Amino acid sequence: MGKILVLSAVTDDCYTKNSAYILKKYLADVQAGLDKYAGLIGADKRAYLLPEGSDTYGIEGDIYYGISNLTGDNPYSVAQNMEGKLPRPMIQDDFIATYKGDEVCVLTPEAARWIAVGSEVKAITVNVKGNSEVKEAKIGTPLSEVVDASGAKAVLVGGLKGEYVKPESLASMTVGTDFNSSSLTVIGADECIVDTLAKHMDQAWVNSCGKCVLCREGTLQYKTMVEDIIAGKAKMTDIDLIKDVGGLIKLGAYCPYGQNMPRPLLSAIELFSGEIEDHIKRKKCPANICYKKAAPYVILPDLCTGCTDCVDECDEDAILSKKGFIHIIDQDMCEQCGACVDACDEDAIVQVEGKMPRLPKKLVRVGKF
Protein backbone atom coordinates (compact mmCIF):
# COMPACT_ATOMS: atom_id res chain seq x y z
CA MET A 1 0.00 0.00 0.00
CA GLY A 2 1.31 3.42 -0.95
CA LYS A 3 0.96 6.62 1.06
CA ILE A 4 -0.57 9.94 0.11
CA LEU A 5 0.35 12.99 2.17
CA VAL A 6 -2.46 15.53 2.19
CA LEU A 7 -1.99 19.15 3.18
CA SER A 8 -5.32 19.90 4.84
CA ALA A 9 -6.26 23.58 4.89
CA VAL A 10 -9.85 22.96 6.01
CA THR A 11 -9.24 22.87 9.78
CA ASP A 12 -10.01 26.50 10.66
CA ASP A 13 -13.23 27.36 12.47
CA CYS A 14 -15.31 30.53 12.08
CA TYR A 15 -12.95 32.46 14.39
CA THR A 16 -9.76 31.50 12.56
CA LYS A 17 -8.15 32.44 9.23
CA ASN A 18 -4.68 31.03 9.86
CA SER A 19 -4.45 28.43 7.08
CA ALA A 20 -5.24 30.89 4.29
CA TYR A 21 -2.79 33.40 5.77
CA ILE A 22 0.04 30.86 5.93
CA LEU A 23 -0.56 29.51 2.41
CA LYS A 24 -0.64 33.01 0.98
CA LYS A 25 2.45 34.29 2.80
CA TYR A 26 4.61 31.20 3.28
CA LEU A 27 3.71 28.79 0.47
CA ALA A 28 7.37 27.97 -0.27
CA ASP A 29 7.99 27.05 3.38
CA VAL A 30 4.81 24.97 3.48
CA GLN A 31 5.79 23.03 0.37
CA ALA A 32 9.32 22.51 1.70
CA GLY A 33 7.90 21.09 4.92
CA LEU A 34 5.51 18.91 2.97
CA ASP A 35 8.36 17.52 0.87
CA LYS A 36 10.51 16.88 3.94
CA TYR A 37 7.75 15.08 5.83
CA ALA A 38 6.80 13.04 2.76
CA GLY A 39 10.36 11.78 2.64
CA LEU A 40 10.36 10.92 6.34
CA ILE A 41 7.19 8.82 6.16
CA GLY A 42 7.75 7.41 2.68
CA ALA A 43 4.77 9.08 1.02
CA ASP A 44 4.98 8.76 -2.74
CA LYS A 45 1.97 11.00 -3.46
CA ARG A 46 0.95 14.46 -2.32
CA ALA A 47 -2.30 16.40 -2.47
CA TYR A 48 -3.83 19.63 -1.23
CA LEU A 49 -7.27 19.85 0.40
CA LEU A 50 -8.60 23.41 0.27
CA PRO A 51 -11.91 24.93 1.44
CA GLU A 52 -14.71 25.08 -1.11
CA GLY A 53 -14.44 28.27 -3.16
CA SER A 54 -10.89 28.90 -1.98
CA ASP A 55 -8.05 30.51 -3.90
CA THR A 56 -5.34 28.08 -5.07
CA TYR A 57 -2.56 30.38 -3.75
CA GLY A 58 -0.39 29.41 -6.73
CA ILE A 59 -0.24 25.77 -5.67
CA GLU A 60 0.80 23.34 -8.39
CA GLY A 61 -0.27 19.77 -7.79
CA ASP A 62 -3.36 17.69 -7.07
CA ILE A 63 -5.91 20.02 -5.47
CA TYR A 64 -9.15 18.88 -3.87
CA TYR A 65 -11.88 21.08 -2.45
CA GLY A 66 -13.86 20.15 0.63
CA ILE A 67 -15.88 21.26 3.63
CA SER A 68 -14.11 23.21 6.36
CA ASN A 69 -14.54 21.33 9.62
CA LEU A 70 -13.01 20.85 13.04
CA THR A 71 -11.94 17.29 12.21
CA GLY A 72 -10.00 18.35 9.13
CA ASP A 73 -6.72 16.99 10.48
CA ASN A 74 -8.08 13.47 10.96
CA PRO A 75 -6.97 11.13 8.12
CA TYR A 76 -10.36 9.41 7.78
CA SER A 77 -12.20 12.74 7.80
CA VAL A 78 -9.80 14.02 5.13
CA ALA A 79 -10.34 10.92 2.98
CA GLN A 80 -14.12 11.33 3.24
CA ASN A 81 -13.80 15.00 2.30
CA MET A 82 -11.68 14.20 -0.75
CA GLU A 83 -14.33 11.72 -1.89
CA GLY A 84 -16.99 14.42 -1.69
CA LYS A 85 -18.64 12.90 1.36
CA LEU A 86 -19.51 14.47 4.72
CA PRO A 87 -16.20 14.53 6.61
CA ARG A 88 -16.38 12.46 9.79
CA PRO A 89 -13.41 11.28 11.85
CA MET A 90 -12.35 7.78 12.79
CA ILE A 91 -10.69 7.63 16.20
CA GLN A 92 -9.09 4.21 16.42
CA ASP A 93 -5.40 3.50 16.95
CA ASP A 94 -5.11 0.64 14.49
CA PHE A 95 -7.39 2.10 11.80
CA ILE A 96 -5.74 3.14 8.54
CA ALA A 97 -7.64 5.66 6.43
CA THR A 98 -7.25 5.18 2.69
CA TYR A 99 -7.99 7.10 -0.48
CA LYS A 100 -7.98 5.14 -3.74
CA GLY A 101 -5.95 2.41 -2.08
CA ASP A 102 -3.32 4.69 -0.53
CA GLU A 103 -2.89 5.31 3.18
CA VAL A 104 -3.83 8.90 4.02
CA CYS A 105 -1.43 11.00 6.11
CA VAL A 106 -2.22 14.60 7.02
CA LEU A 107 -0.40 17.86 7.69
CA THR A 108 -1.89 21.31 8.26
CA PRO A 109 -0.25 24.34 6.60
CA GLU A 110 1.19 25.55 9.89
CA ALA A 111 2.54 22.11 10.83
CA ALA A 112 4.18 21.83 7.40
CA ARG A 113 5.81 25.24 7.78
CA TRP A 114 7.08 24.33 11.24
CA ILE A 115 8.78 21.23 9.80
CA ALA A 116 10.59 23.49 7.34
CA VAL A 117 11.56 26.46 9.53
CA GLY A 118 10.93 25.41 13.14
CA SER A 119 8.02 26.00 15.49
CA GLU A 120 9.13 29.24 17.09
CA VAL A 121 6.33 31.43 15.71
CA LYS A 122 2.55 30.88 15.81
CA ALA A 123 -0.13 32.46 13.63
CA ILE A 124 -3.05 33.80 15.66
CA THR A 125 -6.28 35.29 14.33
CA VAL A 126 -7.32 38.30 16.40
CA ASN A 127 -10.98 39.32 16.17
CA VAL A 128 -12.03 42.72 17.50
CA LYS A 129 -15.39 44.40 16.78
CA GLY A 130 -16.03 42.30 13.70
CA ASN A 131 -12.58 42.88 12.21
CA SER A 132 -10.13 39.99 11.84
CA GLU A 133 -6.35 40.18 11.58
CA VAL A 134 -3.83 37.35 11.60
CA LYS A 135 -0.81 38.15 13.76
CA GLU A 136 2.39 36.23 14.40
CA ALA A 137 3.86 35.75 17.85
CA LYS A 138 6.71 33.75 19.31
CA ILE A 139 5.84 30.68 21.35
CA GLY A 140 5.73 31.68 25.02
CA THR A 141 4.60 35.26 24.37
CA PRO A 142 1.94 36.43 26.87
CA LEU A 143 -1.43 36.67 25.13
CA SER A 144 -1.82 40.18 26.56
CA GLU A 145 0.97 41.25 24.17
CA VAL A 146 -0.89 39.81 21.18
CA VAL A 147 -4.14 41.70 21.72
CA ASP A 148 -5.11 44.71 23.81
CA ALA A 149 -8.29 43.66 25.58
CA SER A 150 -8.28 46.37 28.23
CA GLY A 151 -11.82 47.47 29.04
CA ALA A 152 -13.35 44.44 27.33
CA LYS A 153 -15.86 42.09 28.93
CA ALA A 154 -14.13 38.85 27.96
CA VAL A 155 -11.85 37.16 25.45
CA LEU A 156 -12.58 33.87 23.72
CA VAL A 157 -9.27 32.01 23.56
CA GLY A 158 -9.15 29.18 21.03
CA GLY A 159 -12.40 29.51 19.09
CA LEU A 160 -15.07 26.80 19.09
CA LYS A 161 -12.91 24.47 21.21
CA GLY A 162 -11.55 27.19 23.49
CA GLU A 163 -12.70 29.04 26.58
CA TYR A 164 -13.86 32.47 27.68
CA VAL A 165 -11.53 34.31 30.05
CA LYS A 166 -11.40 37.71 31.70
CA PRO A 167 -9.08 40.19 29.92
CA GLU A 168 -6.74 40.34 32.91
CA SER A 169 -6.12 36.58 32.61
CA LEU A 170 -4.33 37.05 29.28
CA ALA A 171 -1.18 38.25 31.06
CA SER A 172 -0.70 34.80 32.62
CA MET A 173 -1.54 32.86 29.44
CA THR A 174 1.06 32.31 26.72
CA VAL A 175 1.14 31.46 23.02
CA GLY A 176 1.45 27.72 22.47
CA THR A 177 1.42 25.34 19.53
CA ASP A 178 -2.06 23.89 20.16
CA PHE A 179 -5.56 25.03 19.16
CA ASN A 180 -5.87 27.22 22.28
CA SER A 181 -3.64 29.74 20.53
CA SER A 182 -5.42 29.60 17.18
CA SER A 183 -7.52 32.71 17.77
CA LEU A 184 -8.34 35.49 20.23
CA THR A 185 -11.80 37.04 20.02
CA VAL A 186 -12.48 40.14 22.12
CA ILE A 187 -15.97 40.54 23.57
CA GLY A 188 -16.63 44.25 24.13
CA ALA A 189 -17.98 45.69 27.37
CA ASP A 190 -21.14 46.76 25.52
CA GLU A 191 -21.83 43.25 24.22
CA CYS A 192 -24.12 40.69 25.85
CA ILE A 193 -22.42 37.46 26.88
CA VAL A 194 -25.64 35.48 26.40
CA ASP A 195 -26.16 36.83 22.89
CA THR A 196 -22.51 36.01 22.18
CA LEU A 197 -23.01 32.46 23.48
CA ALA A 198 -26.11 32.01 21.32
CA LYS A 199 -24.12 32.81 18.19
CA HIS A 200 -21.26 30.63 19.41
CA MET A 201 -23.46 27.59 20.11
CA ASP A 202 -25.18 27.97 16.75
CA GLN A 203 -21.75 27.62 15.13
CA ALA A 204 -20.89 24.71 17.43
CA TRP A 205 -24.05 22.93 16.28
CA VAL A 206 -23.34 23.63 12.61
CA ASN A 207 -19.79 22.27 12.98
CA SER A 208 -20.78 19.00 14.64
CA CYS A 209 -20.35 16.21 12.09
CA GLY A 210 -23.18 14.28 13.77
CA LYS A 211 -21.29 11.00 14.04
CA CYS A 212 -21.61 10.57 17.80
CA VAL A 213 -24.84 11.08 19.72
CA LEU A 214 -23.29 13.08 22.57
CA CYS A 215 -21.90 15.80 20.32
CA ARG A 216 -24.80 15.79 17.86
CA GLU A 217 -27.50 16.05 20.53
CA GLY A 218 -25.34 18.02 22.95
CA THR A 219 -24.71 20.89 20.53
CA LEU A 220 -28.41 21.02 19.66
CA GLN A 221 -29.49 21.04 23.31
CA TYR A 222 -26.93 23.70 24.19
CA LYS A 223 -28.05 25.82 21.26
CA THR A 224 -31.70 25.49 22.32
CA MET A 225 -30.98 26.23 25.98
CA VAL A 226 -29.06 29.42 25.25
CA GLU A 227 -31.77 30.56 22.83
CA ASP A 228 -34.29 29.95 25.62
CA ILE A 229 -32.29 32.25 27.91
CA ILE A 230 -32.44 34.99 25.27
CA ALA A 231 -36.17 34.45 24.78
CA GLY A 232 -36.90 34.55 28.51
CA LYS A 233 -38.02 30.92 28.61
CA ALA A 234 -35.13 29.41 30.58
CA LYS A 235 -35.03 28.34 34.22
CA MET A 236 -32.10 28.27 36.61
CA THR A 237 -32.25 24.47 36.58
CA ASP A 238 -31.20 24.67 32.91
CA ILE A 239 -27.77 25.87 34.04
CA ASP A 240 -27.33 22.78 36.20
CA LEU A 241 -28.37 20.65 33.23
CA ILE A 242 -25.82 22.39 30.98
CA LYS A 243 -23.08 21.58 33.49
CA ASP A 244 -24.15 17.96 33.91
CA VAL A 245 -24.41 17.39 30.17
CA GLY A 246 -21.03 19.05 29.66
CA GLY A 247 -19.36 16.51 31.90
CA LEU A 248 -20.89 13.63 29.98
CA ILE A 249 -19.90 15.08 26.61
CA LYS A 250 -16.29 15.64 27.68
CA LEU A 251 -16.02 12.03 28.80
CA GLY A 252 -17.90 10.32 25.99
CA ALA A 253 -17.66 12.40 22.82
CA TYR A 254 -15.90 10.69 19.94
CA CYS A 255 -13.31 13.23 18.80
CA PRO A 256 -11.32 16.16 20.27
CA TYR A 257 -13.82 18.66 18.89
CA GLY A 258 -16.74 17.02 20.66
CA GLN A 259 -14.78 16.58 23.87
CA ASN A 260 -13.84 20.27 23.95
CA MET A 261 -17.12 21.65 22.59
CA PRO A 262 -18.63 22.32 26.09
CA ARG A 263 -15.60 24.34 27.24
CA PRO A 264 -16.65 27.77 25.94
CA LEU A 265 -20.18 27.57 27.36
CA LEU A 266 -19.09 26.15 30.71
CA SER A 267 -16.33 28.74 31.11
CA ALA A 268 -18.74 31.58 30.32
CA ILE A 269 -21.25 30.29 32.88
CA GLU A 270 -18.48 30.22 35.47
CA LEU A 271 -17.33 33.78 34.72
CA PHE A 272 -20.68 35.46 34.08
CA SER A 273 -23.11 33.68 36.38
CA GLY A 274 -24.56 37.01 37.54
CA GLU A 275 -25.32 38.30 34.04
CA ILE A 276 -26.80 34.97 33.02
CA GLU A 277 -28.92 34.84 36.18
CA ASP A 278 -30.20 38.35 35.41
CA HIS A 279 -31.41 37.08 32.05
CA ILE A 280 -33.16 34.06 33.54
CA LYS A 281 -34.63 35.39 36.78
CA ARG A 282 -35.20 39.04 36.03
CA LYS A 283 -35.47 39.02 32.22
CA LYS A 284 -32.84 41.73 32.26
CA CYS A 285 -30.16 42.16 29.60
CA PRO A 286 -27.51 44.71 30.68
CA ALA A 287 -26.65 45.34 27.03
CA ASN A 288 -30.32 45.72 26.02
CA ILE A 289 -29.87 43.20 23.23
CA CYS A 290 -31.91 40.19 24.32
CA TYR A 291 -35.69 39.75 24.52
CA LYS A 292 -36.32 41.84 21.42
CA LYS A 293 -37.83 38.76 19.84
CA ALA A 294 -39.68 37.74 22.99
CA ALA A 295 -42.80 39.89 23.20
CA PRO A 296 -43.97 40.03 26.85
CA TYR A 297 -47.30 38.62 27.99
CA VAL A 298 -49.70 41.15 29.51
CA ILE A 299 -53.25 41.02 30.86
CA LEU A 300 -55.56 43.52 29.17
CA PRO A 301 -57.43 45.34 31.96
CA ASP A 302 -60.62 45.88 29.94
CA LEU A 303 -61.00 42.13 29.31
CA CYS A 304 -59.85 40.64 32.63
CA THR A 305 -62.74 39.45 34.85
CA GLY A 306 -60.60 38.68 37.90
CA CYS A 307 -61.47 34.97 37.81
CA THR A 308 -57.95 33.74 38.88
CA ASP A 309 -58.06 30.83 36.39
CA CYS A 310 -54.71 31.93 34.94
CA VAL A 311 -53.17 32.08 38.41
CA ASP A 312 -53.78 28.38 38.95
CA GLU A 313 -51.83 27.56 35.78
CA CYS A 314 -48.76 29.68 36.56
CA ASP A 315 -46.01 27.52 38.06
CA GLU A 316 -43.82 30.57 38.66
CA ASP A 317 -46.41 32.50 40.74
CA ALA A 318 -45.80 35.38 38.35
CA ILE A 319 -49.40 36.68 38.33
CA LEU A 320 -50.45 39.19 40.98
CA SER A 321 -54.11 38.58 41.69
CA LYS A 322 -57.12 38.74 43.91
CA LYS A 323 -60.63 37.53 43.13
CA GLY A 324 -62.54 40.29 41.36
CA PHE A 325 -59.42 42.37 40.75
CA ILE A 326 -57.58 42.95 37.46
CA HIS A 327 -54.61 40.58 37.41
CA ILE A 328 -51.06 41.72 36.66
CA ILE A 329 -48.16 39.70 35.24
CA ASP A 330 -44.85 40.26 37.02
CA GLN A 331 -42.43 40.50 34.08
CA ASP A 332 -39.44 39.71 36.30
CA MET A 333 -41.00 36.39 37.29
CA CYS A 334 -42.71 35.40 34.04
CA GLU A 335 -41.04 32.53 32.17
CA GLN A 336 -43.15 33.19 29.04
CA CYS A 337 -44.38 29.62 28.93
CA GLY A 338 -47.84 30.69 27.70
CA ALA A 339 -49.80 28.42 30.05
CA CYS A 340 -51.87 31.36 31.29
CA VAL A 341 -53.04 32.16 27.76
CA ASP A 342 -54.71 28.77 27.39
CA ALA A 343 -56.37 29.16 30.80
CA CYS A 344 -58.02 32.50 30.01
CA ASP A 345 -61.49 32.12 28.48
CA GLU A 346 -61.74 35.90 28.05
CA ASP A 347 -58.71 36.14 25.71
CA ALA A 348 -57.40 38.80 28.06
CA ILE A 349 -53.78 37.59 28.00
CA VAL A 350 -51.80 38.55 24.91
CA GLN A 351 -48.23 39.04 23.76
CA VAL A 352 -47.42 42.64 22.94
CA GLU A 353 -44.87 43.77 20.37
CA GLY A 354 -43.91 47.41 20.29
CA LYS A 355 -45.71 49.95 22.45
CA MET A 356 -47.15 48.54 25.68
CA PRO A 357 -50.82 49.20 26.48
CA ARG A 358 -51.79 51.15 29.60
CA LEU A 359 -51.73 48.71 32.51
CA PRO A 360 -52.44 49.01 36.24
CA LYS A 361 -49.40 49.16 38.50
CA LYS A 362 -51.27 47.67 41.45
CA LEU A 363 -54.37 45.55 41.91
CA VAL A 364 -57.53 47.41 40.91
CA ARG A 365 -61.11 46.14 41.01
CA VAL A 366 -62.52 44.94 37.71
CA GLY A 367 -64.27 47.81 35.93
CA LYS A 368 -62.56 50.51 38.02
CA PHE A 369 -59.42 51.03 35.89
Q: Where are the regions that the model predicts?
A:
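Iron-sulfur cluster-binding cysteine motifs and their immediate structural context
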Residues: V213-L220, Q259-N260, L266, D309-I326, ...
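Eukaryotic mixed-charge, acidic/polar low-complexity intrinsically disordered regions
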Residues: Y164-V186
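Ferredoxin-type iron-sulfur electron-transfer modules in oxidoreductases and energy-metabolism complexes
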Residues: F179-P296, P301, S321-Q331
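Short, glycine-/Ser/Thr-/acidic-enriched flexible segments
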Residues: T11-D12, S54, P142, L160-E163, ...
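Short glycine/threonine-rich loop-to-helix capping motif typified by GTGT followed
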Residues: S54-I59, V165-M173, V226-E227, A268-L271, ...
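Short loop-to-beta-strand transition segments
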Residues: A149-L160
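C-terminal accessory/binding modules appended to enzymatic or scaffolding proteins
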Residues: V121-E133, P286-Q331, E335, A339
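Hydrophobic alpha-helical positions that pack around
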Residues: K3-L7, D13-G33, L40-L143, D148-G151
